[in-house]
Amino acid sequence: MRIGHGFDVHAFGGTGPIILGGVRIPYEQGLLAHSDGDVALHALTDALLGAAALGDIGKLFPDTDPAFKGADSRELLREAWRRIQAKGYTLGNVDVTIIAQAPKMAPHIPQMRVFIAEDLGCHMDQVNVKATTTEKLGFTGRGEGIACEAVALLMKAGA
């Protein structure tokens, strides 16, 4: 078994909506990013890549490459997952924690889980997404942006 951890953060800026877990969430501000700014999928992709010892999302999809400008993070996740599977890994489970004062995430979490399960070709019971605040403390608590942490468990196929 291999465990990976991922983290991402983006500042608010511009106009909404924001995209988290592949879900478009209405909000007055967007997230500043080279791609679509989906911190949930970026953290998850990093966790998966880390567990497989394949580096990180910035190595695979550099923000200096114009090809990834405005990129759909679901596509990035699917490509990373293809590479991980090519190394002989299967998914145990993933757990994603979104850290934001606003907007409220609860109404959107079920669809995030659906999208992640679709993108990883796994069962819903292998995907958990939750959200928390920092009780108005720090960067996210002041409403300056959104952060996310994710962990992933991989297993060698047939092991």
UniProtKB/Swiss-Prot annotation:
The enzyme's E.C. designation: 4.6.1.12
Example of a GO MF term: metal ion binding
Sites where the protein binds 4-CDP-2-C-methyl-D-erythritol 2-phosphate: 8-10, 34-35, 56-58, 61-65, 100-106, 132-135, 139, 142
The keyword Metal-binding is annotated on this UniProt entry: yes
Chain sites annotated for binding a divalent metal cation: 8, 10, 42
Known catalytic reactions: 4-CDP-2-C-methyl-D-erythritol 2-phosphate = 2-C-methyl-D-erythritol 2,4-cyclic diphosphate + CMP
The protein's required cofactors: a divalent metal cation
Site (Transition state stabilizer): 34, 133
Keywords from the named record: Isoprene biosynthesis, Lyase, Metal-binding
Record's cofactor remark: Binds 1 divalent metal cation per subunit.
Pathway membership, UniProt: Isoprenoid biosynthesis; isopentenyl diphosphate biosynthesis via DXP pathway; isopentenyl diphosphate from 1-deoxy-D-xylulose 5-phosphate: step 4/6
GO biological process terms, semicolon-separated: isopentenyl diphosphate biosynthetic process, methylerythritol 4-phosphate pathway; terpenoid biosynthetic process
Function: Involved in the biosynthesis of isopentenyl diphosphate (IPP) and dimethylallyl diphosphate (DMAPP), two major building blocks of isoprenoid compounds. Catalyzes the conversion of 4-diphosphocytidyl-2-C-methyl-D-erythritol 2-phosphate (CDP-ME2P) to 2-C-methyl-D-erythritol 2,4-cyclodiphosphate (ME-CPP) with a corresponding release of cytidine 5-monophosphate (CMP).
Family membership: Belongs to the IspF family.
Subunit: Homotrimer.
HAMAP family in alphabetical order: IspF
Protein name, per record: 2-C-methyl-D-erythritol 2,4-cyclodiphosphate synthase
